[in-house]
Structure formats: C-alpha cells, structure tokens
Amino acid sequence: SRDVVNIVRKIYKTKKVGHAGTLDPNATGVLPIAIGNATKIVEYIQSMGKCYVGEMTLGIETDTLDTEGTILKKETKVISKEDITKALKYFEKTYNSKEVYLDKNQFFEVIKEYDNKKISQIPPMYSALKKNGKRLYEYARLGIEVEREKREAEIYSLIILNFYDNKIRFEVNCSKGTYIRSLFNDIASDTDNFAYMSSLCRSKYGIFKIENAFSLERLKNFNENQLYNSLMKIEDVFEYERIDFDKKYFKHISNG
C-alpha cells in the first residue's frame, strides 16, 4: 500500500497523498487514495465497511496464513464428499490419516457461526499492527512471537461462492479491522482442517467499488485533464443528505 502511495505521488506530482485500509502484499482490489485536503477524511473512510472475495485452500498451512509465507504443513491428497460416498474405503482412509476431508455440509454449518456476527480475532503475526512501537511483521521476521490482544470485528455477511478441488471461494462483507486470513484459518480449524488464504480481492470499500477504480498502469498513461477527472470531490465521499441554507446562517452552523 505504501508503494502505491509513492507511485501516486509521482503521477499527480504532489507529496500530500494518503491511503485508507492496507492491502496485504498478495491481495488485489480497491485501495482508496486521498490527495491534498482529502487526506483529512482518511479516518472517516477507514470506518467504512469492506467487501472481499477470497479463496481458501485446504490442506496447506503457512506461517503468514497466505501465499507469502513458509509452508508449515501440507497434505498430499484431498478427498471430497463425493469420493467418500463412492467407496467406503476412502472414508476409512481419510478418517485414519491426515488427508483432507472436504465435507460441504460441515462448512455450511460452520459458516452460520460467522455470518452476520460479531467475532473476536487474534491478529496474525505477519500484519502491520503495532506493538510497542514496532510492526508485528518486524517481530515475525526476527522469529519473535509476541502476545496479541483479541480484536473485535463484525461479519455482515459470509457467503460460499463455490467449491472446487480443495479450494473454497467466499464473499465476505465485514467491518474495518477484520483479518480475512485469520477468518479463513478459524473456519478451517472449526472443521478439523487447516488452510491458507490463496487469493484475496477487495471488491468494495464503502462507496468505492472495483468497477469504478483505476489501475496504476492506467493512471500512468493519463494526461493532465484525465488525471483531474479521475478524482472524486471530497463531498461526494460522504453518504449524507445535502442541505442548502441561506448564507446568513453559515457562521452559526460553522460554530455548531
């Protein structure tokens, strides 16, 4: 996310650039960028809800809970529920070994415990959260694990989009401060499996939608007029009703 800010500074030729909501290195999607006076409303933007489409891969666990990390555990085979119903021996083999048993019904039951619920999460060690003035990932890179307090988050909706092989795709609508990597890890654990987040795309951040976003590659090819037109007005970010009033009341309203 910091790299994106630095690139935008060069494109728009200004130092006053900020962003809302850090994206993981392997994640794609919406990253709201604020330029000039708009940096004053970053805190407001960060309070908005988010929507992600993510993929969980069962049978692999990494130290970062995503594709960036070192593999800690790996299973050699994934057996689906359909395979098990075809032959009892597959069920027996799955039960007695560490191979992954993908029971779709079990996942749907577990999802109910997260859907439209407030949850508590322990932030992953590989995250930008600070502890004693240092980022957690800085401790993690030194092989130091520090105690992390649970953080509250809210899952507005959690939908399974599809199953394929040992992978499950989800759509998650959630509050700020939600760690999707940790969510996937918890869901897998609740089904007696382990997994990692194999892909993640933030499709929406408050009023900002991916279909209206500009890629860095596209911005780099914009002329000055196109760059200006790519920016939203600050007042358009706020989801408040517009009220027009007489000029004589301006001072009173400004002073509260």
Where are these regions (language model features)?
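Catalytic/RNA-binding core of pseudouridine synthases
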Residues: 1-256
